[in-house]
Amino acid sequence: MLKIERPNFIEIGVGDYTEANTRFIYDRFYPKGIIIDSEKDLKKKVLSNINYWKGDLIILEERISSENINNIISKNCDFSIDIFSLDIDGIDYWIINKLKTNISKIFVAEYNAVFGASLEVTTPNLKNFDRKEYHYSHLCFGVSLKALINIMVKKNYYFIGTNSARNNAFFISNDYPIDKYFKNLKIEDINYYVDSNIRESRDIEGNLNYLSK
């Protein structure tokens, strides 16, 4: 549909790469990609759970900021990006704000459903932001869906929906117009996409207390 035969990707925020958004792509399509995370001993951990021969994968142990993101990409990326995925539980909005317009065909970004449907909010652009340290609940992180959609519109993308967990939003470059490529797509009211059942809140002592809203 989007003329992608063997997806090239960049994913920021992958942990040890066992649950990353591009993991299936790497295993299935033998692609070229870059994964970035601040996880200690990242390359060792990733190599322990993938077949490294399956693709041309660059593994970067870096803490991404709005100041270094473009430099890191320009230094390491020598290919056209089909899929860009971002999930760092923090200053995601400010990273997107610094990215060049239309950086990829498909863009996947985490959002915080706890912020609700009407608020256009994000966390402050703090160096070394850590959701666990910023607020004991662990719930103040990332960006609201409304704010994410609006910044992505400025970056020349349109919204096509989310995953069923209601924490990852999907966007398509306007180079692939919705009336041509997704003409039968139905976009629900934004309230639908923030109705999440994920319960990862903590009490002041750091224990999970499973608040739903």
PLM regions: where:
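Rossmann-like AdoMet/SAM-dependent catalytic core
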Residues: 1-10, 18, 24, 29, ...
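SAM cofactor-binding core of SAM-dependent methyltransferases
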Residues: 1-75, 79, 83-86, 113-116, ...
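A structural signal for short, well-ordered beta-strand segments and their strand-loop junctions
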Residues: 11, 35, 85, 106-110, ...
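Short aromatic/hydrophobic-glycine micro-motifs
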Residues: 30-31, 38, 104, 156-158
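Hydrophobic packing residues within well-ordered alpha-helices of enzyme cores
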Residues: 46, 73, 95-99, 171
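A short alpha/beta connector and helix-capping loop motif
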Residues: 56, 94-133
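Active-site glycine- and acidic-residue-rich loops that bind
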Residues: 85-95
